[in-house]
């Protein structure tokens, strides 16, 4: 090998390594707090359209959700009808008559960000064209359309297809397209993405099967096809993974069901509070165009949202449990703690959090603030107790 050849080989390898490092750094600079937004799937399934998405963008602004921190409008499955003769992905012309870019432009005009859905297999979960073999081609389209967020599913993959390699491939394709795009890994937790998702450039990864709009209990989607999860089942699967979350890489216990009608308002407050203390992405899944004031007030509670979005990026965890009663704690950037008192039971009960449980010396005097009541409760020493309604929570911050 000549010196000149050796030089060019060294230069090429160095350039590729530098590019890979730059792309890795770029992806990790995204989603430094858990993404907040709205997704079509939980409420509308495959019934997506330009009008629906534009209406949701309007509602996100008018309802106060944008001011509360929500920013992504995400079209989930079933927007794509086919690939053309060149292999380009094509949206349904009757549902999106002006194309996807026009929808993205409208979302951006509202000061929001735009997200879209695809799949690592040959077809999406809804049977539409998947991304396998078209990763770079699709990424170029996404960048040209103005996509800011990609949810990438795991249906209809090939026998033996490697999830880690597949998600690394789509991340590299997105980076090569030149637009910063948050990557949401959606393979339902079966291959433990919390162990490799950050390394391959994912910004969030699903940790469980799909959520269903109910308090608790697993349910088959169809005979032999397991399973969807009640809200508490999701919580119990996601909680032990707290050490794997942080700025730019989040455990995703699935989208919110708040407002879809399967739970009480108390249960929806619990749902929202537990997602917040787990530093989970807050992706609303209801019809935000027509939600009632009670649901709106749950979704735009800025004090609870601040717990979720705290810059320290620590996922909270369960620190005490006795039967149906639990205490959850999350360290905050200012040195305080966010604490959830949870009552899973059928009747009201008092729940107590001790300072030792949340990481403070027992003799310390600390101020306590009620985040759903929006009021300071005073100074307490050693512990804080409160009555908690059935299936409810009390959420407080504690700070010496």
What label would you give each PLM region?
Residues 20-24:
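Boundary at the C-terminal end of the N-terminal hydrophobic targeting segment
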Residues 34-40, 69-76, 113-118, 148-153, ...:
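Structural recognition of the beta-strand scaffold that forms the well-ordered cores
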Residues 134-137, 182-286:
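Glycan-recognition surfaces
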Residues 270-319:
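Catalytic cores of secreted or luminal carbohydrate-active enzymes
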Residues 275-278, 283-285, 321-360, 391:
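Carbohydrate-binding surface patches
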Residues 378-400:
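C-terminal beta-strand-rich structural cap/linker in extracellular carbohydrate-active enzymes
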């Amino acid at each position: 090998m000549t010196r000149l050849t050796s030089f060019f080989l060294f230069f090429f390898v160095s350039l590729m390594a530098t590019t890979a490092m730059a792309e890795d750094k770029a992806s990790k600079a995204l989603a430094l707090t858990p993404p907040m937004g709205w997704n079509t799937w939980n409420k509308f399934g495959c019934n997506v359209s330009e009008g629906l998405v534009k209406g949701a963008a309007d509602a996100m602004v008018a309802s106060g959700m944008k001011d509360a921190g929500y920013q992504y409008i995400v079209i989930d499955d079933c927007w794509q009808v086919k690939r053309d003769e060149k292999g380009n992905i094509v949206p349904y012309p009757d549902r999106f008559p002006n194309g996807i870019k026009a929808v993205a432009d409208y979302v951006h005009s509202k000061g929001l960000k735009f997200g879209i859905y695809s799949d690592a297999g040959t077809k999406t979960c809804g049977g539409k064209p998947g991304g396998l073999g078209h990763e770079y081609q699709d990424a170029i389209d996404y960048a040209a359309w103005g996509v800011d967020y990609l949810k990438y599913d795991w249906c209809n993959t090939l026998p033996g297809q490697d999830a880690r390699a597949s998600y690394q491939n789509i991340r590299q394709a997105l980076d090569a397209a030149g637009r910063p795009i948050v990557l949401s890994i959606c393979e339902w937790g079966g291959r433990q993405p919390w162990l490799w998702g950050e390394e391959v450039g994912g910004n969030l990864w699903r940790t469980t099967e799909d959520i269903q709009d109910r308090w608790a209990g697993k349910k088959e989607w169809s005979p032999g096809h397991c399973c969807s999860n009640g809200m508490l089942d999701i919580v119990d699967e996601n909680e032990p993974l707290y050490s794997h979350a942080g700025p730019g890489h989040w455990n995703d216990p699935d989208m919110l069901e708040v407002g879809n009608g399967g739970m009480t308002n108390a249960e929806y407050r619990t749902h929202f509070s537990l997602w917040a203390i787990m530093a989970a992405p807050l992706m609303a899944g209801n019809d935000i165009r027509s939600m009632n004031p009670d649901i709106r007030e749950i979704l735009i509670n800025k004090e609870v949202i601040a717990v979720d979005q705290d810059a320290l990026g620590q996922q909270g965890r369960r620190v005490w449990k006795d039967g149906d009663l639990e205490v959850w704690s999350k360290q905050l950037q200012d040195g305080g703690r966010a604490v959830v008192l949870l009552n899973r039971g059928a009747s009201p009960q008092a729940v107590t959090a001790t300072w030792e449980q949340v990481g403070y010396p027992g003799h310390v005097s600390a101020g306590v603030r009620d985040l759903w009541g929006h009021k300071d409760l005073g100074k307490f020493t050693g512990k804080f107790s409160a009555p908690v309604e059935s299936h409810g929570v009390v959420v407080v911050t504690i700070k010496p």
